[in-house]
Structures are given as C-alpha cells and as structure tokens.
Amino acid sequence: TASKTQFKNPDVKFVNINVTPFDAAKESAEMVVADAREALVALTEELADYRVDESYTAEIAAEREAWAAKVEQCYHVGNAPLPAQTEVFGALNELMGDEDVVINAAGSMPGDLQALWQAKTPVQYHVEYAFSCMGYEVPAAMGVKLARPQSEVVSIVGDGTYQMLPMELATVVQENIKVIYVLLQNYGFCSIGALSESRGSQRFGTKYRQRGEGSHLADEQVIDGVDIAANARSWGLDVLEVHTIAEFKEAYRKAEASDRPTMIHIETDLYGPNPPGSSWWDVPVSGVSELESTQRAYEEYLRDRKPQRHYL
C-alpha cells in the first residue's frame, strides 16, 4: 500500500482472500479465508463477463509500452566507468533460457528485478521478498538446482549479502552442484545506503571504506585486502573476473558450458542508476538534528505523510 498512500480513491474497497486466518486481517478490508485454487475458480466464474472501459484498456496498453521502453533504457544505459547492475540483469535476461532460473533475495536487486525482469516462463523467476533474507541466494541455488537439474540456475549475489553465508559454498563444491553465482561488487549496501541518504543520514556506515586517519568516520578509500573473488576461489569455485558487460556475456557462456560451480565477479556502480520508483515508505526521520540534510528530510517526511489514508 506504499505506507497507506497508494490507494487514494475513497470509493474503492478491497476484498482480501488469504489461505490462513492470521493473514486475512487487513485494515478496513473484508476478510475472506479460502483455499487458493477454489477461490480463483469461483472468482473466474463470477467475473467471466466483467470488462473494463475501452479507454482504460487503452491507457493500460500505453503504460505498458512506456514501461517497456524504460526497461530497455535500464538494460542498456551504458553507465561508466562501472556498469549499472541493471545492465547485468539485462544481459542475463537475454542469455538465460526459458527454463533457466534466476535467484535473488536482498538489497536493491529484488526491487530492480521485479521492475525489469521479463520472465519467459513461471519457473524462471525465484526471488525472496519477505524479510530481505541476506545470504539466502547462496544455499537457494543448491536447492533449486537439485529440484531442476535440467535448468541453468543463476544466483545473483551482492557483496553485502555474500558475506552473510559463504560457507554454504563448501557443500556446493563438495557435491559438485553446477550453479552459476553472479557476484555484484559495489563495496557497500546499495539499498540501505540510498534509504539512509533519503532520510538525511548521508549513507552513514553503509560503504566499505577505510577509517580516515585521526577520525572516527570512514573516508572514500575502499577497504584494502578484502577480496571476495579470492574468497570464492578458496571455497573451490571456478571464478571468472570481468569488468564490462561484453566480458560478462562471454564469461556467462563459459560458465554455462562448464560442469562445475562457477562465480562471475563484476564490479558495479553503487549509485545506480536504478529504475524509477514512485512509492513512498513511512520511515521516520529524526525530528532533532544538527545536520541540514536531516532537517530537510524531516520536513519532507511531514509533508509526505499527509496523503496517508488511515483506514481504522
């Protein structure tokens, strides 16, 4: 609901159908508990003759066309000197087969993938959203590959989430489970850093940077000695290090042809660009601060809360 700001028409009501009573209670909505399949069958029969206005159908078609153009722009943005992560997604979307599976879980990537990924089949898209479960991508690739040995399984992992669960790679190598890990190294937490900046906190503590000499704050010097590609090699993976999208595509074809678990390592731009988003999230801002950025963010927060609909 975009923190109660998305649905502004007071004449619209929602019927939520859930498979468990616990999840059925939504603010101001009718609550229905039903078997998912039976509910869909009943709704299909009930709404069989329903049609929206032709003007609305045309509006939807125009919006879809406009978004398709935006997807192409994000996939081929040509960011420099480092590629944007959306360019990596575009390359994968082009290279992966209809029955192959892409996996992701945490950070800014699930949002980007939801906005941009063009799934060719229902099985191709495997993304965990619920609690941004950092590290899920590493063991999830094992499970999906065991369930679908005929598919190429590609797990996209950020350098932040990788550090949560790399030890699972030992099992991947031990069992020679042929998966492809795509490691995007941007030396920081992209999603939470952007949120911090939008809340006036200037990305504090969200980048992998050396502490400044004589200071308690990090400067712009990337931490020396942390080598994730070398770490992956130490677990026994084949690692292909690339720097451009053209090199990435070539590396993917090599990984695809291999019979061993492989990581493709590429540095991407911490600052995007990312696909546009218009939803608002109610994340409170400090009401008292000496930082001008926080003071401005607090004023914006008070302004942006006004359109909220309080259903109860």
Explain the meaning of each model-derived region:
Residues 1-62, 196, 256:
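Glycine-rich, acidic loop regions that bind phosphate or pyrophosphate groups
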Residues 55-59, 105-106, 266-267:
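Short coil/turn segments at secondary-structure boundaries
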Residues 53, 83-84, 227, 244:
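A diffuse structural propensity rather than consistent per-protein peaks
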Residues 40-51, 64, 68-71, 75, ...:
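Structural signal for hydrophobic packing residues in well-ordered secondary-structure cores
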Residues 64-140, 144-145:
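Active-site diphosphate/adenylate-binding microenvironment
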Residues 8, 24-25, 31-33, 37-41, ...:
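Thiamine diphosphate
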